[in-house]
């Protein structure tokens, strides 16, 4: 029992009190803005003579040392003596700088945890594709899946309160709270009319950190309750006594939460429950019955509302049967179908025909969302008809081709695990023809005449990139390289980029 209580209590090793001095170091804010991505660093608004400078950081740090300036002006927030007139710029600098500082302890904890578990190549765990082999292995044996839209906190103060378990330094938390409340526009970043947490692009790093910290807190308790009840399956006398001891723990944990809602210990005893999360969506799959899945649904809703002060409703959790439902996750439509096969068995003079159905985990590329992304980025219209890119018509031919080839390569790279490639081939066709239309528009030539003059060079550019990716899996001497249709999961993909943001 003491072990369970110790887990739910604050781990002293998770507290850090060295963060506040780092806030007053100028290089932290320079580091936060300079990631080698060819973007603006610290842009000081000096009229037409804009320039990059760290002097603005120095001025901001000097004001931060003057503690008597840290007073929230309730009457005139736009003319606060601390933030001055450059509120947007200062707030962005503080948010990104603070995010860099508070992220420091987490990589250290992750590395130490992986070293204890002797996990090699831990960077592979960051890959988005590392989730799909797990789904292929586990979901074949499950019956129901719940699509969960994770609720967001109803107030920013909840995010700060969650962080206090990780950061012992009260000064850092007070400073964070000051900027969250002073920069009132940030409150509008959380849109209650939408079903997921909406972040500002300008301050995305800090809000992602606060949100993930909040989600991690309730996931840790949720996973702990789940694990304590399902890892003992033996019926031997020794294990039976230990199992009774664990059921006693579960009973005590349920009593600890009984003040807010009723829960039953048998809810946690299903050994075939799997949980996967990415950003604002998670999936809970089980081999249990619809009744058990509904129990999980209402348990999660009460768990969020009563213990983590986030508002949620049961309608945000959709329960479907895996055999007749496809769930959208990480850019794929996934489902578990039956692959029929017929086996002929000969026994002496008698023969038998056996119909056998084997479960198969299908992962396909959803064509409609991809066409929508291409239409948003002006590669085609909403019907999927390729169009030219006038914004790039002033670039050189090689730059235009390289850009289209890079996008085509990235899409092929990410969707290489698809069971059916037909949809992906259509996307490649749209990009190739859009590239040809862009080049023809630049040279003021009809597309057909331009392609005839260019020959097969344009097509070879796209095929060359595809061959480079495929050569990692199929040897160059293999005659089946062009016919290879197997799934390929890459462990170097750590993010999904919107095509519209990479013009």
Swiss-Prot record:
This is Maturase K. Keywords: Chloroplast, mRNA processing, Plastid, RNA-binding, tRNA processing. Belongs to the intron maturase 2 family. MatK subfamily. GO terms for biological process: mRNA processing; RNA splicing; tRNA processing. It comes from Liquidambar formosana (Formosan gum). The lineage of its organism: Eukaryota, Viridiplantae, Streptophyta, Embryophyta, Tracheophyta. Pfam families: Intron_maturas2 (PF01348), MatK_N (PF01824). One of its GO terms (molecular function) is RNA binding. Usually encoded in the trnK tRNA gene intron. Probably assists in splicing its own and other chloroplast group II introns. It is found in: Plastid, Chloroplast. HAMAP family: MatK. One of its GO terms (cellular component) is chloroplast. It comes from the Eukaryota.
């Amino acid at each position: 029992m003491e072990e369970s209580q110790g887990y739910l209590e604050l781990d002293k090793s998770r507290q850090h009190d060295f963060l506040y001095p780092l806030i007053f170091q100028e290089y932290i804010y320079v580091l936060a803005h300079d990631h080698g991505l060819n973007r603006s660093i610290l842009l000081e608004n000096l009229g037409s003579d804009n320039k990059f400078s760290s002097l603005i950081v120095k001025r901001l740090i000097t004001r931060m040392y003057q503690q008597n300036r840290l007073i929230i002006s309730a009457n005139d927030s736009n003319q606060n003596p601390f933030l001055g007139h450059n509120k947007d710029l200062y707030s962005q600098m503080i948010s990104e700088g603070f995010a860099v500082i508070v992220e420091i302890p987490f990589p250290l904890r992750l590395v130490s945890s992986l070293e204890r578990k002797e996990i090699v190549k831990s960077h592979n765990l960051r890959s988005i594709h590392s989730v799909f082999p797990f789904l292929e292995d586990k979901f074949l044996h499950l019956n129901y899946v719940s699509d969960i839209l994770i609720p967001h906190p109803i107030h920013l103060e909840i995010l700060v309160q969650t962080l206090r378990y990780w950061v012992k330094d009260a000064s850092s938390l007070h400073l964070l709270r000051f900027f969250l409340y002073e920069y009132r526009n940030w409150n509008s970043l959380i849109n209650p009319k939408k079903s997921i947490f909406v972040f500002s692009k300008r301050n995305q790093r800090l809000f992602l950190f606060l949100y993930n910290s909040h989600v991690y807190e309730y996931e840790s308790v949720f996973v702990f309750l789940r694990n304590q009840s399902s890892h003992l399956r033996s019926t031997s006398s020794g294990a039976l006594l230990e199992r009774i001891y664990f059921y006693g723990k579960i009973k005590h944990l349920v009593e600890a939460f009984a003040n807010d809602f009723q829960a039953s210990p048998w809810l946690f005893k299903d050994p075939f429950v799997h949980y996967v999360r990415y950003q604002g969506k998670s999936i809970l799959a089980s081999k249990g019955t619809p009744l058990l899945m509904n129990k999980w649904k209402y348990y999660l809703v009460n768990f969020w509302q009563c213990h983590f002060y986030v508002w949620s409703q049961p309608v945000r959790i959709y329960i479907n049967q895996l055999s007749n439902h496809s769930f959208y996750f990480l850019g794929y439509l996934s489902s578990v179908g039956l692959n029929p096969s017929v086996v002929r068995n000969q026994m002496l003079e008698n023969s038998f025909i056996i119909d056998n159905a084997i479960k198969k985990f299908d992962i396909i590329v959803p064509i409609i969302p991809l066409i929508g992304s291409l239409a948003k980025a002006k590669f085609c219209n909403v019907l999927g008809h390729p169009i030219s890119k006038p914004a790039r018509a002033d670039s050189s031919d090689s730059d235009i081709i390289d850009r289209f080839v890079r996008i085509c390569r990235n899409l092929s790279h990410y969707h290489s695990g698809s069971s059916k490639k037909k949809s992906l081939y259509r996307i490649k066709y749209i990009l190739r023809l859009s590239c040809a239309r862009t080049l023809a528009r630049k040279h003021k030539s009809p597309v057909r005449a331009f392609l005839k003059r260019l020959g097969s060079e344009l097509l070879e550019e796209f095929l060359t990139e595809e061959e480079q990716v495929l050569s990692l899996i199929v040897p160059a001497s293999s005659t089946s390289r062009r016919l290879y249709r197997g799934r390929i999961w890459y462990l170097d993909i750590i993010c999904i980029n919107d095509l519209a943001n990479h013009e």
